[in-house]
Amino acid sequence: VAAGLVGAHPVLFQAMQAALAPGGHAYLDVPTAIISKRPGQLPRLSGPLALGSSGAEDFLLEYLDDKPMQDVAWGRLDRAGIARLLALHPLAYTLTARPAYIADRGASALADRIESALESGPKLTVLVGHDTNQALLAGMLGLHWSLGGYPADDPPPGGGMLFLLSHDARGTPYVTLIYQVQTMDQIRNLDVLTMANRPAMAALPIAFCGHRAAPTACTLAGFTRMIARTKTRVIAR
Protein backbone atom coordinates (compact mmCIF):
# COMPACT_ATOMS: atom_id res chain seq x y z
CA VAL A 1 0.00 0.00 0.00
CA ALA A 2 2.77 2.44 0.96
CA ALA A 3 4.68 1.67 -2.23
CA GLY A 4 1.48 2.27 -4.20
CA LEU A 5 1.13 5.76 -2.73
CA VAL A 6 4.68 6.57 -3.82
CA GLY A 7 3.96 5.35 -7.33
CA ALA A 8 0.72 7.35 -7.49
CA HIS A 9 2.45 10.68 -6.85
CA PRO A 10 5.63 10.63 -8.99
CA VAL A 11 5.85 14.40 -9.53
CA LEU A 12 5.56 15.11 -5.81
CA PHE A 13 8.27 12.64 -4.86
CA GLN A 14 10.55 13.80 -7.65
CA ALA A 15 10.18 17.36 -6.36
CA MET A 16 11.18 16.16 -2.89
CA GLN A 17 14.18 14.37 -4.42
CA ALA A 18 15.23 17.66 -6.02
CA ALA A 19 14.94 19.45 -2.68
CA LEU A 20 16.78 16.82 -0.64
CA ALA A 21 19.62 15.82 -2.93
CA PRO A 22 19.54 17.08 -6.51
CA GLY A 23 21.81 14.86 -8.53
CA GLY A 24 22.71 12.87 -5.42
CA HIS A 25 21.49 9.73 -3.68
CA ALA A 26 18.05 8.73 -4.99
CA TYR A 27 15.95 8.41 -1.87
CA LEU A 28 13.16 6.99 -4.02
CA ASP A 29 15.24 3.82 -4.38
CA VAL A 30 14.91 3.07 -0.66
CA PRO A 31 12.36 0.29 0.02
CA THR A 32 9.00 1.46 1.36
CA ALA A 33 7.44 -0.33 4.33
CA ILE A 34 5.03 0.02 7.25
CA ILE A 35 6.70 -0.81 10.56
CA SER A 36 5.26 -1.71 13.96
CA LYS A 37 7.97 -2.73 16.40
CA ARG A 38 5.77 -3.87 19.28
CA PRO A 39 2.09 -4.49 20.11
CA GLY A 40 0.18 -1.32 20.93
CA GLN A 41 2.61 0.95 19.09
CA LEU A 42 1.33 3.19 16.31
CA PRO A 43 2.68 2.03 12.94
CA ARG A 44 5.54 3.94 11.38
CA LEU A 45 6.73 4.26 7.82
CA SER A 46 10.15 3.72 6.33
CA GLY A 47 11.30 4.70 2.88
CA PRO A 48 10.37 7.58 0.57
CA LEU A 49 7.01 8.44 2.15
CA ALA A 50 8.52 8.59 5.65
CA LEU A 51 11.48 10.68 4.49
CA GLY A 52 9.28 12.90 2.35
CA SER A 53 6.72 13.53 5.08
CA SER A 54 9.28 14.39 7.76
CA GLY A 55 11.40 16.37 5.30
CA ALA A 56 8.45 18.49 4.18
CA GLU A 57 7.53 19.20 7.79
CA ASP A 58 11.13 20.16 8.56
CA PHE A 59 11.15 22.61 5.65
CA LEU A 60 7.86 24.08 6.91
CA LEU A 61 9.29 24.55 10.41
CA GLU A 62 12.34 26.30 8.97
CA TYR A 63 10.03 28.71 7.14
CA LEU A 64 7.80 29.29 10.17
CA ASP A 65 10.90 29.96 12.30
CA ASP A 66 11.62 32.99 10.07
CA LYS A 67 14.91 31.62 8.79
CA PRO A 68 16.37 33.45 5.77
CA MET A 69 15.08 31.80 2.61
CA GLN A 70 18.59 30.72 1.64
CA ASP A 71 18.57 28.62 4.82
CA VAL A 72 15.15 27.07 4.18
CA ALA A 73 15.59 23.72 2.38
CA TRP A 74 19.11 24.88 1.44
CA GLY A 75 17.56 27.70 -0.58
CA ARG A 76 15.88 25.25 -2.96
CA LEU A 77 12.24 26.02 -2.11
CA ASP A 78 10.01 29.06 -1.86
CA ARG A 79 6.83 29.17 0.21
CA ALA A 80 4.74 27.71 -2.61
CA GLY A 81 7.21 24.86 -3.03
CA ILE A 82 7.06 24.08 0.68
CA ALA A 83 3.25 24.05 0.61
CA ARG A 84 3.30 21.72 -2.38
CA LEU A 85 5.67 19.22 -0.76
CA LEU A 86 3.77 19.42 2.51
CA ALA A 87 1.07 17.27 0.87
CA LEU A 88 3.33 14.34 1.76
CA HIS A 89 2.58 14.94 5.45
CA PRO A 90 -1.17 14.16 5.40
CA LEU A 91 -0.49 11.48 2.79
CA ALA A 92 1.57 9.59 5.36
CA TYR A 93 -1.24 9.92 7.89
CA THR A 94 -3.60 8.09 5.52
CA LEU A 95 -1.58 4.99 6.46
CA THR A 96 -0.43 5.67 10.02
CA ALA A 97 -3.31 7.55 11.70
CA ARG A 98 -6.53 7.80 9.69
CA PRO A 99 -7.46 4.12 9.14
CA ALA A 100 -10.37 3.26 11.47
CA TYR A 101 -8.59 0.42 13.27
CA ILE A 102 -5.67 2.70 14.14
CA ALA A 103 -7.66 5.88 14.77
CA ASP A 104 -10.14 4.20 17.13
CA ARG A 105 -7.32 2.96 19.34
CA GLY A 106 -5.16 6.03 19.09
CA ALA A 107 -7.90 8.61 19.72
CA SER A 108 -10.48 6.88 21.93
CA ALA A 109 -8.97 8.03 25.25
CA LEU A 110 -8.69 11.63 24.03
CA ALA A 111 -12.22 11.55 22.58
CA ASP A 112 -13.50 10.22 25.90
CA ARG A 113 -11.84 13.18 27.66
CA ILE A 114 -13.42 15.61 25.20
CA GLU A 115 -16.83 14.01 25.72
CA SER A 116 -16.45 14.31 29.50
CA ALA A 117 -15.54 18.00 29.20
CA LEU A 118 -18.59 18.66 27.03
CA GLU A 119 -20.97 16.82 29.33
CA SER A 120 -19.84 17.99 32.75
CA GLY A 121 -16.64 20.03 32.49
CA PRO A 122 -16.00 23.73 33.18
CA LYS A 123 -16.86 26.37 30.61
CA LEU A 124 -13.38 26.11 29.11
CA THR A 125 -11.16 23.04 28.90
CA VAL A 126 -7.80 23.24 27.10
CA LEU A 127 -6.06 20.05 25.97
CA VAL A 128 -2.59 20.29 24.44
CA GLY A 129 -1.49 17.63 21.99
CA HIS A 130 0.36 16.92 18.77
CA ASP A 131 -0.45 16.82 15.07
CA THR A 132 -0.71 13.04 15.34
CA ASN A 133 -3.46 13.44 17.95
CA GLN A 134 -5.37 15.61 15.49
CA ALA A 135 -4.88 13.13 12.65
CA LEU A 136 -6.10 10.27 14.86
CA LEU A 137 -9.19 12.25 15.93
CA ALA A 138 -9.82 13.11 12.29
CA GLY A 139 -9.75 9.44 11.37
CA MET A 140 -12.01 8.50 14.26
CA LEU A 141 -14.59 11.26 13.66
CA GLY A 142 -14.41 11.32 9.85
CA LEU A 143 -13.09 14.88 9.66
CA HIS A 144 -11.72 16.60 6.56
CA TRP A 145 -10.57 20.17 6.02
CA SER A 146 -8.71 22.45 3.65
CA LEU A 147 -7.80 25.93 4.86
CA GLY A 148 -5.02 28.38 5.59
CA GLY A 149 -3.08 27.56 2.42
CA TYR A 150 -2.08 24.12 3.74
CA PRO A 151 -2.72 20.85 1.89
CA ALA A 152 -6.05 19.12 2.46
CA ASP A 153 -6.26 17.34 5.83
CA ASP A 154 -2.83 18.55 6.96
CA PRO A 155 -2.67 19.31 10.72
CA PRO A 156 -0.15 22.19 10.77
CA PRO A 157 1.77 23.61 13.74
CA GLY A 158 -0.54 25.58 16.00
CA GLY A 159 -3.70 24.06 14.55
CA GLY A 160 -6.56 23.64 16.99
CA MET A 161 -9.82 21.72 17.17
CA LEU A 162 -12.50 23.67 19.03
CA PHE A 163 -15.40 21.58 20.32
CA LEU A 164 -18.17 24.06 21.09
CA LEU A 165 -21.28 23.23 23.11
CA SER A 166 -24.46 25.20 22.44
CA HIS A 167 -28.20 24.76 22.97
CA ASP A 168 -31.17 25.37 20.70
CA ALA A 169 -34.41 27.07 21.76
CA ARG A 170 -35.67 23.80 23.26
CA GLY A 171 -32.53 23.35 25.32
CA THR A 172 -31.14 20.48 23.23
CA PRO A 173 -27.32 20.51 23.43
CA TYR A 174 -25.29 20.43 20.23
CA VAL A 175 -21.59 19.99 19.49
CA THR A 176 -19.96 22.07 16.75
CA LEU A 177 -16.36 21.43 15.73
CA ILE A 178 -14.29 24.39 14.48
CA TYR A 179 -10.83 23.81 13.02
CA GLN A 180 -8.49 26.79 13.33
CA VAL A 181 -5.02 27.37 11.87
CA GLN A 182 -2.69 30.29 11.47
CA THR A 183 -1.37 30.77 7.96
CA MET A 184 2.31 30.19 7.24
CA ASP A 185 3.00 33.90 7.00
CA GLN A 186 1.04 34.75 10.15
CA ILE A 187 3.35 32.44 12.09
CA ARG A 188 6.54 33.43 10.24
CA ASN A 189 5.84 37.13 10.77
CA LEU A 190 4.58 36.68 14.35
CA ASP A 191 1.44 38.53 13.33
CA VAL A 192 -0.82 39.79 16.09
CA LEU A 193 -4.17 38.10 15.51
CA THR A 194 -7.07 40.54 15.46
CA MET A 195 -10.60 40.64 14.08
CA ALA A 196 -9.08 42.13 10.93
CA ASN A 197 -6.26 39.56 10.80
CA ARG A 198 -7.86 36.35 11.92
CA PRO A 199 -6.56 32.81 11.73
CA ALA A 200 -8.24 30.62 9.14
CA MET A 201 -11.29 28.86 10.60
CA ALA A 202 -13.89 26.40 9.32
CA ALA A 203 -16.75 24.47 10.87
CA LEU A 204 -16.26 20.76 10.10
CA PRO A 205 -19.02 18.19 9.64
CA ILE A 206 -18.60 15.31 12.10
CA ALA A 207 -19.18 12.60 9.52
CA PHE A 208 -19.69 9.73 11.96
CA CYS A 209 -22.05 11.56 14.32
CA GLY A 210 -25.17 9.86 13.01
CA HIS A 211 -27.58 12.45 14.46
CA ARG A 212 -26.74 15.70 12.72
CA ALA A 213 -29.27 18.50 12.93
CA ALA A 214 -27.19 20.43 10.39
CA PRO A 215 -24.06 19.57 8.37
CA THR A 216 -21.75 21.04 11.03
CA ALA A 217 -23.79 20.35 14.19
CA CYS A 218 -24.08 17.10 16.11
CA THR A 219 -26.37 16.56 19.07
CA LEU A 220 -24.46 15.92 22.26
CA ALA A 221 -26.39 12.67 22.61
CA GLY A 222 -25.29 11.61 19.13
CA PHE A 223 -21.70 12.58 19.86
CA THR A 224 -21.77 10.57 23.09
CA ARG A 225 -23.19 7.49 21.33
CA MET A 226 -20.52 7.76 18.66
CA ILE A 227 -17.74 7.77 21.28
CA ALA A 228 -19.39 4.82 23.06
CA ARG A 229 -19.54 2.82 19.81
CA THR A 230 -15.87 3.52 19.19
CA LYS A 231 -14.90 2.25 22.64
CA THR A 232 -17.02 -0.86 22.04
CA ARG A 233 -15.20 -1.53 18.75
CA VAL A 234 -11.82 -1.14 20.42
CA ILE A 235 -12.75 -3.66 23.13
CA ALA A 236 -14.33 -6.08 20.64
CA ARG A 237 -11.27 -6.16 18.42
Model-derived features: where do they sit?
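Signature for phosphate-centric chemistry
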Residues: 1-125, 131-237
